[in-house]
C-alpha cells in the first residue's frame, strides 16, 4: 500500500498512506503478539507506570509489523456498568482516566507510533448505558467528567483524536462542529488530526453512504 501510494508514475500526487489499527490490549489482531489485560483491569491495578510500559510494548510490536498508528487509548469514563464497552474504560473516575491518559500517549508516541485519544466525547456516559446512545449532560459536566482524559492526552501531545458514535443531547458527535472544532480545538487546544470512528460519518444527516 505504501509503495503504491507514493508512486507518481501515473500522475498520482504521491501522498503516502498511513494505516491505523485497534491495538487496544496489545497488538490484538496479530497472531503471536503479546496480549495484555483490557483497560478496566489496568485501571483497577491503579499503576499508571505499569500501564505506560504496556503501551510502549504494544507500540513496539505494532511498529514491527509496519503500522504507524494505534487507535488507542480509550479515555471513556464508564458511568453505567450496563454499557457493553465498559471493559475499554480505565474506570468510572475522571481523575483516574486523566492519570493514565498522558502516560499512555507519551509511551506510544515515544516509540514512534501515532496515538489516538478516543472516543471524543461522552461515550461512557450515555443514557442507561446504551451503546452509541445519547449523553445528556450540560457542557460543563460533559467536560468535567468525560473530558479529563483528553486534557491529559492533549498536554502529552497526542496527534489524533477519534470522534465518538454517541450523541450529545440529541446531536451526533460526528459532524458536530461545536464539539469537534470549537471545544476540542478552540478550548482544549488540540491541533492534530480528527478521525471518524468506523463509518461514523455515515450517521451524519446528509452523509449516508
What role is predicted for each listed range?
Residues 1-209:
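Glycoside hydrolase catalytic-domain context in secreted enzymes
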Amino acid at each position: 500500500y505504501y509503495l503504491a501510494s507514493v508512486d507518481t508514475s501515473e500522475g498520482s500526487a504521491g501522498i503516502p498512506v498511513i494505516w491505523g489499527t485497534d491495538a487496544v490490549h496489545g497488538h490484538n489482531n496479530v497472531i503471536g503478539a503479546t496480549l495484555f489485560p483490557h483497560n478496566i483491569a489496568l485501571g483497577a491495578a491503579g499503576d499508571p507506570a505499569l500501564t505506560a510500559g504496556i503501551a510502549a510494548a504494544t507500540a513496539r510490536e505494532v511498529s514491527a509489523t509496519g503500522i504507524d498508528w494505534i487507535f488507542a487509548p480509550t479515555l471513556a469514563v464508564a458511568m453505567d456498568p450496563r454499557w457493553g464497552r465498559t471493559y475499554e474504560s480505565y474506570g468510572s473516575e475522571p481523575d483516574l482516566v486523566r492519570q493514565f491518559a498522558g502516560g499512555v500517549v507519551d509511551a506510544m508516541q515515544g516509540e514512534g507510533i501515532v496515538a489516538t485519544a478516543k472516543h471524543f466525547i461522552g461515550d461512557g456516559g450515555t443514557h442507561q448505558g446504551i451503546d452509541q446512545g445519547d449523553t445528556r449532560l450540560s457542557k460543563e459536566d460533559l467536560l468535567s467528567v468525560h473530558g479529563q482524559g483528553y486534557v491529559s492526552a492533549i498536554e502529552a501531545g497526542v496527534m489524533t483524536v477519534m470522534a465518538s458514535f454517541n450523541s450529545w443531547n440529541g446531536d451526533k458527535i460526528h459532524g458536530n462542529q461545536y464539539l469537534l472544532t470549537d471545544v476540542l480545538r478552540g478550548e482544549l487546544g488540540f491541533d492534530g488530526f480528527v478521525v471518524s470512528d468506523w463509518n461514523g460519518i455515515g450517521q451524519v444527516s446528509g452523509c449516508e453512504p
